[in-house]
Structures are given as C-alpha cells and as structure tokens.
C-alpha cells in the first residue's frame, strides 16, 4: 500500500525483485518490518538494502558496493544515474529500465565513490550517461564528481524543478512527464567549447542582417565594402607611391 502512494506498481516491484520481510535494524535495536532492495551482479544476489518505516537503512557490511540495478544497463549505450532505489523504481514506471542508483545516497564533501570504481567497466561503451540526482547540495556535489570521473563529453544532466527527486516528480506530475524530463536532459557544457545553440541568436542575426558595420572613414565607395573595429590589426599594401600613407592618414583622422 505504501508503494502505491509513491506511484509504484506491483509489476515494477516484481520486475526489480523488491521484497519485504523482518530484519534486525541496529538503529532501533530490534527486528523490524522492512522493504528489501536486492542488489544483483551478473544475476547473483550480492547485497540487500533494508529500509524500515522510520527510514532507517542497512546494507550488509563487507559486501562489495555496486550500483543498484546494474545488470539492467548491460547491452545499452545509454543509462540514467539516480540517487536512490525509489528513483530507479519511478523511472521504471516511466518506461526507463536502464536506470541505476548509487547504493548509499550522496554525502557532502565526500568523493569516495567506491561503487563506481567497482562498476567502471559497465560504462566503457556508454555514449550517453544521464545524471538525474537530487537537487540539494549533496546531490549536486555527487553530480559534479560523477561528471569528473565519467567525462563531461558523455554526461547529460536534468533537474526536477520544484521536486527533490525522480520519485517525487512522478507522484506530483506523471510518468509521462517524468519520461520527458529524462529524455530532454541537456549535455554538460564543455569548457572552451562553443556549440551552435550557444550562439544561435548571433547566427540568426547574421543570416538576416549580415555583418554589422564598424568604424567608417567617410569614403562612400570604400565604406560600402569595408569597416574597422577596435583591436583589429590591418595591413595596408600596394605598389610604391600608390597613396598608402595618405590612405592610412585618412583612416586615422
């Protein structure tokens, strides 16, 4: 019933092998009813994240940290990285099966992404990696580090406007709107690289109006074909005694 309030169907829970059961939670010191997110690598169960009603979490100590749902990006050239298992379920509801989640959320001032180191080979053939993490400070720090490690040229980013994450966006809007939010992710701006979209207005103005006139020297026949700009280097050439100096003097005046 709780999953229904979060927009998650039984089909999604079954397909992603989410289970429930009793588990001892150290935060409460007793056995609790828990949701169990099962982590698989190569079809083998490698870890389980337990969540109780008080939002306490537990992962098995000593198990190798990996992305949740990592098996489902195999064979794809695109994937989506989110910050929690519930966001993976939300994207699955929107028809996106190739979404993965970091196992332990985002932490401000921590670049320890051992789960990425353990799964780095999965990204070798990815041509597009969409990062759709939370909008808070830890989430944005995680986004920055993922971009740094995976390469800005491959990464795309999206936000959820007035919502914190993908699951909240699904609940407030719809699976269709969530799908649109992901498919319209924007490429990460590359340092010292200008794209057409960056100068679209300037190009449109040039096509419609041509070059803008610079400084002119007052000779109509010349001004119709040439004008100057500040910080421009101009070389004046010609045969001897053709009036080069007089021409330069005219420009200076």
Predicted regions and their residues:
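Short, small/acidic-rich helices and loops at N termini and domain boundaries
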Residues: 1-35, 72-81, 128, 141-201
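A residue-level signal for conserved active-site and pocket-lining positions in enzyme catalytic cores
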Residues: 3, 43, 131, 166, ...
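Phosphate-handling DNA/RNA-contact segment within nucleic-acid enzymes
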Residues: 23-125, 143
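Short, highly selective alpha-helical patches that border small-molecule cofactor pockets
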Residues: 88, 139, 143-147, 248
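Short, acidic/turn-prone active-site loops that include or flank metal/cofactor-
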Residues: 102-108, 135, 159-162
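Short glycine-centered, acidic/aromatic-flanked micro-motifs in structured strand/loop junctions
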Residues: 133-135, 238
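The Walker A/P-loop phosphate-binding site
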Residues: 191-253
